Structures are given as structure tokens and as C-alpha cells.
Amino acid sequence: MAARRRPRSAVPRRVATLSVHTSPLDQPGAGDAGGMNVYVVEVSRRLAERGIAVDVFTRAVSSDLPPVVEMSPGVTVRHVSAGPFEGLGKEELPAQLCAFTAAVLREEAQHEPGHYDVVHSHYWLSGQVGWLARDRWSVPLIHTAHTLAKVKNAALAVGDRPEPRARVIGEEQVVAEADRLVANTADEARQLVDHYGADPRRTLVVPPGVDLDRFTPGDRTAARRRLGVAEDAVVLLFVGRIQPLKAPDLLLEAAARMLADDPALRDRLQVHVVGAPSGTGLEAPRQLEQLAAGLGIADLLRFLPPVHVELLAEHYRAADVAVVPSHNESFGLVALEAQACGTPVVAAAVGGLRTAVRDGVSGVLVEGRDPADYAAAIRAVLARRELLSAGARRHAGAFSWERTVDSLVAAYTAAAEEMAAASQRAVPGTLLRPAWALGGVRALGAQVAR
């Protein structure tokens, strides 16, 4: 007989957040850490501030990591041992999902039934784990994809590998089973419906936010002084992981075109790249250095490692323009952070960047991949920088993590109420399971049986 569960409130008391492949404790801008890490950190902190406890489950990548870390009051990061600590690429993680899921279920089994009220999974790997946890705990699964394989494969960069069929199938399963699908933008919501057959009634748009207390306008001259940048320099800034998808090479080609059109810029133009290698293909700083040398702009290129948020804000303030030339972005938090600091953005007119940047008001969106078009857009921003800077601040001010969390809590509550109502009408039947778990569910259930 199943254990008796405590009565649930529709408003959650505790959320199990799943982030299998990357930890909220990792430094964004390196390896697999990026905007999703920022999202998990900011949302978790603000949920905790509202009295909703959060446990973040992530795969341990070192034996030195403590099993449990209090990230902030009310937010606990739980490092799960699942497979070798080191040497596993993201594409190898599906084989570790059974072990990861077993550990998550064991943790919940140590508590009174009904310990978690909601599961919120991030990325498709976590969604597969969340699907099984949802069925076992009888709680709603909220899923945020962050990126979608079908969309990424339609916009592959040179040197990048297509996402495997297994991921596509896994995403389709999670989309079919999640109680709510959270899309960053209306474009992403349409992609979920059109490419994955998502139920529009369960798909909601919740834009990410920006920390408006940390990313603020400031004195550009003072920021440059602190960073050792000449006051009269023209600084083009790229922030993010150095990988084909992010296309830092396109920024270098645009800078070379600017110099070809105006050689007098050579003494002032600088290209700052803040980030570290990730992914495949054109990923190493050395390769970007070789490209810069071939373009004749090696002396303009400056690499900086990923930095803490306070110093990152200084880099945004010191820049004339932030450039986000990605092949695709589900949103583009970097663009929003730059604008919050008063720095206008030149970005690709793709995906969520069409929402993150307001064309002609907070920056310029560029159609296509022609470096000449990017060079022209950068020049246009430089010519109107003060006006666009004011527009950037106003635009970013409309996005806050508080609004994001307002919408998420409403989604959690609505999904819980819907599940409670459905349970009154339920007819016993067979639950589907994730494909990777078929054949292993009985053993997994035995490991976590109460």
C-alpha cells in the first residue's frame, strides 16, 4: 500500500530543480555553463526569498565536491554521483540518467511523502529525469528547454555537429509529458508547437530577466580606467562561450571590414572577447587568434577569461557596443545584461534576440551573416550611441527576475491545481516511461522503494 501523503497546498513549498549537465555553481561563459546557469541561480534565489525552498540536483564532476552545498538561504545544491566524475561529454550523459534518477528518488525517499511539490527541469536531459520523478511523486513537471535540437540543427554553424536523433526523441517525449512548457519567447513557444507538437494550452511564455541591481549604468571613463582601456578606444565586446554557435569569428570579420572602410580606426579599435572554449569546431582562442592574424587585426584582439558578475558589468560599461552574432539563441541574456548597463547591442536577428534587443531603439538587429552588414550596423550604433544607450536602459528595465518568478509561481500553482483535479477523475492505467528507462524501471523502483 502506498504511503499516505501529506495534504498539498497548490502554492508550492519546495521545488526540485533538475540541472543534470551543468551546475548553478559553475562560472558562466566556460564549458557548458551559460545563460541556463544564470537562469537557475536567479530563479532559485528569488523563489527562496518568497519562502519556497529549492533543491537543485546536478551531476557531480569531481570527487572533491561536497554532496550538499547551500548556494544561498533556502537554496541547496545537491551533487549527484552518476558516472565518471571527469571526461564525460554532454552527448555521453544519457547513459548516466538511470543512476542520476535513482539518486534523486533516493533523496526524496528519505523524507515524508509529499516532500516536493513541483519538479522544474532544465534542458532535455533533466526533462527525462523529471518525467520519472513526476510519475513517482505525483507532482507537476514544469520544463524549460533552453535550447531545442530541431532549431539548432536548422541553424548549424560551420564546424558544429548536429544534435543527435536521441536528443530529438528525448525532447519530443518531454514535450508530450510535461504539465507546463516554459518558453523564453513567443518564437520559442511557436517552435515547440510547430516542431514538437506541444499543446498550446500547456505552453506559456515567460521571458527571463536581468539583475537590475547589479547590471546598472555607470561611468564609462571610470570603468575603462579600472580595466586598463584607453579613454578614446572604440571597444567592441563579445561575451560568451567560444563556440561555433556563438560566432565570435563573425565579429572579427566585421572588425576587419570596419578597418578596411576606415583605416584611421586602427589606433582606436579594440575587440574584447570575454569567455572560454566550449563545444566543437572553432572553439579555442588560438583559432580565433589565427583568424585575427589572417585578417590583419591580431593587435586589436584581447582575450579575457569569464569573470564574476560585478566585473562583467564593468566590461559592459566600458564597451561602446556589445555584439551578439550567434547563429541562434533561445533568448540572449548577454544582450539584456549589456543593455541594462547602458550599452547598445548589435545582434543577429534570430530566435530570442529579436525579443532581447529592440531594433532601432536599444540596438540593431542584423539579418543574414554578411560581415559587411555587421560592420555597417556597428557604425550606425556608434553614430547614435547616446540615444541608443538611453533606449537600451529603458528596454532592459522591462525585464526583471521578479516578473519571471511571478509567472513561474503562477505556472506551478496552476499545474498543481490541474493535477489535483485530474487525480479525482483518474482511471488506473499504465504510465509511459522515458525510452532510456524502459527495461530498467523495475530495478530502479527497487532501489528507491520505501
Curated annotation (Swiss-Prot):
Keywords noted in UniProt: Glycosyltransferase, Magnesium, Metal-binding, Transferase
Superkingdom per UniProt: Bacteria
Binding site for 1D-myo-inositol 3-phosphate: 21, 32-37, 90, 123, 147, 167
A molecular function GO annotation: acetylglucosaminyltransferase activity
EC class of the enzyme, as a word: transferase
Pfam families xref list: Glyco_trans_4_4, Glycos_transf_1
Protein family per UniProt: Belongs to the glycosyltransferase group 1 family. MshA subfamily.
Known role: Catalyzes the transfer of a N-acetyl-glucosamine moiety to 1D-myo-inositol 3-phosphate to produce 1D-myo-inositol 2-acetamido-2-deoxy-glucopyranoside 3-phosphate in the mycothiol biosynthesis pathway.
Protein name as annotated: D-inositol 3-phosphate glycosyltransferase
Species whose genome carries this gene: Geodermatophilus obscurus (strain ATCC 25078 / DSM 43160 / JCM 3152 / CCUG 61914 / KCC A-0152 / KCTC 9177 / NBRC 13315 / NRRL B-3577 / G-20)
